[in-house]
Structure formats: C-alpha cells, structure tokens
C-alpha cells in the first residue's frame, strides 16, 4: 500500500500520522535527507542509528541503542526542530544538506581512506569499525599537506595559508564520537567552523592531548568560528565529504547556512 508523507501539523492525529524511519548510519541518513530536499521541509523524518559512527545520534540526544531509539520514536507526540547544514557550492552549482559535518582536508581524506578499506565491513560486523578509522588516520596523517583557504563571515575575511583540517559542523561530534566543538548546538541556527593549521608532529600530539581534555581552544593553531553564514574558498583541490559521503576532490567556493528540518524521536 502506498503511504504519502505529510507535512507536520499540530491538528493531525498522531496515531495515524505517517513517519519515514531511516535505519542505517550517518551516510544513509545523509542520502535520505537529500532525497527529501525538494519536498516540504515540514515533513518529519525519524532515524534509528545502525552505523559505525552514529555522530548525528550523539549530537541530538538520540539513543544509539536500537531498542531504546525505537522506544523514543514510539513515545514521541510531536517532532523536534533540528538545524541541518545547508551548503551551496558555486563552482559546480551543487546544493545539499548535511546533518553532521562538511569537511575538506584531513578529515575528508581519512573518510575516503576508511571507505576504501577492505577490512571496514568485516570490522563493523564486530563493532570494531573504529580500528579501521584509526588505521586510516595513521596512513593519511603524514600524506596530507597544508593548503590555502579563505574564510568569509560577518563581513570579515580570514586567510589561512596552511590549513590542515577544515570542518563545518552543527553539533559537537565528528569522526565517530570526537567532541571537536563541545558548545555546538544543533538547535541553534548557526554553523560552527574549525580550522586546524598544518604543524609539526609534536604540536599535533599536544593538540590531540588538549582535544581529549576538551581544551583545544588553548592551541593557537586551532581556530573556531561561528556564524549564521560562512563562506569558504579553496583554490587547491582537496577531498571533500559531507556526513562521510565523498563529494569529490576539487577546489571549492562554498557557502554554509542552516536549514530547519523536523525529526521524530
């Protein structure tokens, strides 16, 4: 039987209201929400996290336990408003949504390497997907070079000649549970940008130590920006990802804002 997805309204009967439930990881959720992009943004979407990272679930307070997540969904009576990242890339006229992060440089290269790993699926079956991710970090870390970027926000421009990691996020987590911006809030209509400069291994290790203690802001090589609209220009081609889905390797001129979507949990 066909079911028509409907925009949410307070006067609708909750017991008969149709809900699309996504089962999968962050990449699956990314693909579904972008498939719904042309439709009414008031159509609610539900989600049961079954992936290896499940950063969206962490970021919005949805249980990563399948049974508990289902219980959250069943007892819900109205959807929650979550701000997603809306990105527009001028060079290729590309438009999309991300529920977690959009990154270029190191994190995108790590994601690409992990996705190429022949051991990823096998490790995920035993809930050891993080081992594949760690292996990719070690492999990519020494190969990733610094690259120039221009950041534009609030009428100001910031130039980084040797960016190493550049990530736009709407909640605290990336990389399967790393709290890179503890203050990021997916219910606020702002995006957070992190830029880490290319530095030597000893300074990187110190930055990782600070990151584990959530004191990364003390490093002068760690830069955090927040705004309702951020533009990033990179003239040197870099690997780009959105929610762990590789968008390609290219130069970009990308503008990031937020778009409110309804989630049922």
Regions found by a protein language model. Name each.
Residues 25-28, 50-53, 104, 171-172:
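Short glycine-rich anion-binding loops that position phosphate/pyrophosphate groups of nucleotides
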């Amino acid at each position: 039987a066909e079911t028509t997805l409907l925009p949410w309204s307070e006067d609708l009967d909750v017991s008969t209201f149709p809900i699309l439930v996504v089962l999968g990881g962050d990449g699956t959720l990314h693909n579904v929400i972008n498939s719904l992009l042309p439709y009414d943004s008031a159509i609610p979407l539900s989600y049961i996290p079954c992936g290896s990272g499940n950063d969206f679930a962490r970021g919005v307070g949805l249980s990563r336990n399948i049974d508990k997540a289902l219980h959250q969904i069943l007892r819900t009576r109205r959807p929650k408003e979550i701000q997603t990242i809306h990105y527009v890339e001028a060079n290729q006229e590309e438009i999309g949504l991300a529920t977690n992060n959009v990154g270029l440089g190191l994190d995108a290269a790590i994601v690409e390497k992990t996705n190429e790993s022949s051991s990823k699926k096998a490790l995920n079956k035993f809930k050891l997907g993080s081992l594949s991710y760690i292996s990719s970090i070690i492999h990519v870390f020494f190969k990733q070079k610094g690259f120039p970027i221009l950041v534009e926000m609030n009428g100001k421009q910031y130039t980084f000649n040797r960016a190493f990691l550049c990530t736009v996020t709407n909640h605290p987590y990336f990389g399967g549970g790393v709290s890179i911006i503890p203050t990021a809030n997916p219910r606020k209509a702002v995006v957070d940008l992190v830029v880490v400069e290319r530095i030597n291994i000893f300074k990187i290790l110190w930055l990782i130590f600070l990151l584990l203690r959530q004191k990364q802001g003390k490093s002068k090589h760690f830069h955090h920006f927040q705004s309702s609209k951020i533009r990033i220009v990179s003239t040197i081609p870099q690997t780009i990802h959105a929610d762990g889905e590789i968008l390609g390797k290219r130069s970009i001129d990308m503008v990031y804002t937020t778009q409110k979507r309804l989630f049922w949990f």
